[in-house]
Design a protein with these regions (language model features):
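A C-terminal cap/extension of S-adenosyl-L-methionine-dependent methyltransferases
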Residues: 9-23, 38-46, 263-328
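Conserved SAM-binding loop and adjacent beta-strand
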Residues: 87-103
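Positions that flank functional sites
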Residues: 70, 220, 266-267
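Residue-level "edge-of-site" marker
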Residues: 68, 165-166, 264
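Conserved SAM-binding loop
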Residues: 14-17, 21-22, 100-226, 239-253, ...
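N-terminal juxtadomain amphipathic helix
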Residues: 3-88
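A SAM-dependent methyltransferase catalytic signature shared across enzymes that methylate proteins
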Residues: 26-34, 247-263
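Short glycine/proline- and charge-enriched loop/turn segments
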Residues: 79-88, 226-235, 275-285
């Protein structure tokens, strides 16, 4: 089947980029599903739309049909990553990202002085780079499914680079009980199997170690108001969006003690800005330039209203800090 390297054209009913549609919730098994949103690839590298379903019983949101391994690889290529970074930079500046990483690291300084730390979904290693200011004696390693983690190693932002997912066969066994802290910042939504990723995270943690998970909140009111223009829906790359209650229950079932649940500080003030940027993404460059003042207005509203949003159901993310049990 002939394809373009950028925009594959599917000429049969079989789509190699998607698995068969499932009729039950991957989290609780319920068959009471509702399509929450249908959204196109914002970069238009592929035709069609991607659907996100929500379970009426447990609230888990998930891509359905889900990307296949081939589809996941396509949407994590370096070429796609660079173009996505350009779109994201219109919503959240690199300086804002650096400030956010520093603030997050500062808030985790209560973890004292861990010897070793694995940042999962590290990308270019920007969080470890920022965290070294507050944890100067900690060894930071990075894990990511893309080649960005190898660049982070070359540029000295991580001490070891691991390519893949925690649940990649052999990964957890190789890193067994090596780390005092494992962080998964906006990584779990990209994982094909979030539960397997959590189990693997606990495998690489030492007894008594800390697991920090931050995920977009599918119950955020912006998700309802903005629909497919709510950035954390993240189609086609976001595969799962578990609500806080589900993730907390899963970690407790795995024997963890929940130390912190936080909806306030993980909120990122970009919902309105991102909605405008996604609306303008398919427009010609001249129209995007002419409409740039709209982005400025939206950004101002996001930041002015952030103190209110982060204290209400408009908060767009949550964080859980859990401690692994000391004995098996």
């Amino acid at each position: 089947m002939p394809t373009s390297p950028l925009t594959p054209q599917i000429t049969t009913d079989f789509d190699p980029f998607q698995e068969p549609r499932r009729e039950d919730c991957p989290w609780c098994g319920s068959r009471r599903l509702r399509t929450r949103v249908r959204a196109p690839d914002p970069l238009r590298h592929r035709q069609g739309t991607f659907a996100l379903d929500r379970c009426r019983d447990c609230g888990h949101a998930f891509q359905n049909p889900r990307l296949s391994a081939e589809g996941i690889a396509f949407f994590h290529r370096d070429f796609y990553e660079r173009h996505l970074d350009e779109l994201t930079a219109r919503v959240l500046s690199p300086a804002a990202v650096r400030r956010r990483h520093r603030t997050t690291a500062w808030r985790l300084s209560a973890l004292h002085e861990p010897e070793s730390w694995l940042d999962v979904g590290t990308g270019h290693g920007r969080f470890p780079e920022a965290a070294k200011e507050f944890f100067p004696y900690t060894s930071f390693d990075g894990l990511d499914p893309t080649a960005r983690v190898e660049q982070a190693l070359r540029e000295g932002r991580v001490e070891e680079a691991h390519r893949g997912y925690l649940a990649t066969p052999g990964m957890a066994a190789r890193l067994h009980a090596r780390y005092d802290v494992v962080t998964l910042f906006h990584h779990l939504e990209h994982a094909p199997d979030p539960r397997a990723e959590l189990r693997a995270a606990l495998t690489v943690l030492r007894p008594g170690g800390h697991l920090v998970v931050e995920v977009p909140d599918p119950r955020c009111l912006f998700a309802t108001l903005l629909g497919r223009r709510w950035l954390p829906y993240g189609q086609p790359r976001h595969l799962h969006l578990p609500p806080l209650a589900n993730l907390r229950a899963e970690l407790e079932a795995l024997g963890c003690t929940i130390l912190v649940t936080d909806r306030k500080h993980p909120h990122v003030p970009y919902d309105l800005t991102a909605a405008v940027a996604l609306s303008l993404a398919p427009a010609p460059p001249l129209l995007q330039l002419a409409a740039s003042p709209l982005l400025d207005v939206a950004a101002a509203l996001d930041h002015v209203l952030a103190p209110l949003f982060r204290r209400t159901r408009f908060s767009n993310a949550y964080r859980i800090v859990a401690r692994k049990q000391l004995t098996p």
